[in-house]
């Protein structure tokens, strides 16, 4: 009799523990899913703004089709924030796309999200915002970026993009274009680190993918503004190839 009652008691405790655990999981999901959805909307907004930044720079002729055709990859960073006074910080993120094929001579890949951050030196009181487009000009710097964190100015040499020609485009690892308050200029991200934003890539594609998986793979299909970026860049390949 005592054994039967003890068994019933244990079963009751087990059921309560199960339902408590299940309730905790449901509550956690209810808290996480809205945040996940909100973050995904931010990712999609970043892609939308990246489309605008790249289109503006191409339309302005700041980035010539001839120089773009020499690039292995392009990293678009809309709205990079710099903050502080004297020595401050910077941060932003955006999509990286690369030419397909072993020699980076094919069409453009799906976009992989990357982040940029680090210290900045200057007299910006409060904060400033700059749009950047970075052209990665050789396989060495592409491999560095795809394989992990890359520090600008240390791991890769960067030069101002405006004024670069197809002949001089290969002199630097990275050509940098910047736009602050509508003014185009060749500006530096010296000291900033570039690395993959794995969380954003998971939200955009629904599975765990590295930056290398996305831009060097062939089975990753972008949608919406991600596909619009690919289409825009591919359209420049019709008349200007490597």
Regions found by a protein language model. Name each.
Residues 1-3, 33, 110:
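Intrinsic-disorder/low-complexity coil detector
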Residues 1-19:
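N-terminal secretory signal peptides that target proteins for export/translocation
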Residues 21-32:
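Bacterial N-terminal signal peptides
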Residues 38-242:
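Small-residue-enriched, tightly packed secondary-structure blocks
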């Amino acid at each position: 009799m005592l054994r039967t009652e003890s068994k019933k008691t244990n079963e009751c405790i087990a059921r309560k523990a199960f339902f408590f655990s299940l309730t905790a999981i449901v509550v956690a999901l209810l808290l996480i899913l809205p945040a996940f959805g909100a973050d995904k909307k931010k990712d999609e907004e970043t892609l939308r703004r990246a489309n605008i930044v790249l289109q503006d720079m191409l339309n302005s002729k700041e980035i010539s089709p001839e120089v773009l055709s020499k690039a292995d990859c392009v990293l678009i960073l809309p709205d990079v924030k710099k903050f502080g006074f004297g020595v401050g910080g910077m941060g932003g993120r955006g999509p990286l796309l690369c030419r397909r094929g072993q020699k980076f001579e094919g069409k453009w890949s799906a976009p992989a999200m990357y982040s940029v951050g680090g210290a900045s030196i200057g007299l910006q009181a409060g904060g400033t915002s700059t749009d950047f487009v970075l052209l990665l000009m050789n396989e060495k710097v592409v491999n560095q970026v795809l394989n992990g964190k890359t520090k600008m100015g240390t791991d890769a040499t960067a030069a101002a993009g405006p004024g670069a020609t197809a002949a001089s485009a290969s002199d630097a690892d990275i050509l940098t274009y910047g736009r602050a308050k509508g003014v185009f200029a060749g500006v530096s991200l010296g000291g900033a680190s570039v690395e993959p934003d794995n969380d954003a890539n998971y939200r955009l594609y629904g599975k765990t993918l590295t930056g290398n998986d996305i831009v060097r793979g062939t089975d990753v299909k972008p949608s919406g503004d991600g596909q619009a970026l690919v289409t825009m860049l591919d359209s420049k390949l019709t008349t200007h190839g490597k």
